[in-house]
Amino acid sequence: DCPWDWSSHEGHCYKVFKLRKTWEDAEKFCTEQARGGHLISLKSTEEVDFMIKLAYPILKANLVWIGLRDFWRDCHMGWRDHANLLYKAWSDEPNCSVAKTTDNQWFRRKCNISQYFVCQSRVPR
């Protein structure tokens, strides 16, 4: 089971943090919150819908960091947890990524700005 203050969805635990951090600081924070924790990886429209329902009522904010980043600055985007990037929802927009909490769109943002974020980890066994 997920910790009491995290939400469960399809084998993962999620928590919205009403803190503003840079992408790096948010990712580090997520790794400290739960074993195997990272910024959220959105792999399907169902997972995006779940994140929107979870995040928007808490944050009333438009954008959250997600775990997608251009790690090698070569325009090759990859999920922080190394999952395959099969599902995509890009708008046309620098090296880190945010998702809108009001609809299904992703944007690139400079990694050093502060945003709210959602952490994700596997359900502990």
From Swiss-Prot:
It is found in: Secreted. SUPFAM superfamilies: C-type lectin-like. It holds the Pfam family Lectin_C. The keyword Manganese does not apply. Keywords: Disulfide bond, Glycoprotein, Hemostasis impairing toxin, Secreted, Toxin. One of its GO terms (molecular function) is toxin activity. One of its GO terms (cellular component) is extracellular region. Residues 9-120 form the C-type lectin domain. Expressed by the venom gland. Glycans are attached at residues 95, 112. Disulfide bonds join 2-13, 30-119, 96-111. InterPro entries: C-type_lectin-like (IPR001304), C-type_lectin-like/link_sf (IPR016186), C-type_lectin/snaclec_domain (IPR050111), CTDL_fold (IPR016187). SMART domains: CLECT (SM00034). The keyword Metal-binding does not apply. PROSITE patterns: C_TYPE_LECTIN_2. It comes from the Eukaryota. Belongs to the snaclec family. Heterodimer; disulfide-linked. Interferes with one step of hemostasis (modulation of platelet aggregation, or coagulation cascade, for example). Shows greater sequence similarity to the beta than alpha subunits compared to other heterodimer snaclecs. This is Snaclec B6. The lineage of its organism: Eukaryota, Metazoa, Chordata, Craniata, Vertebrata.
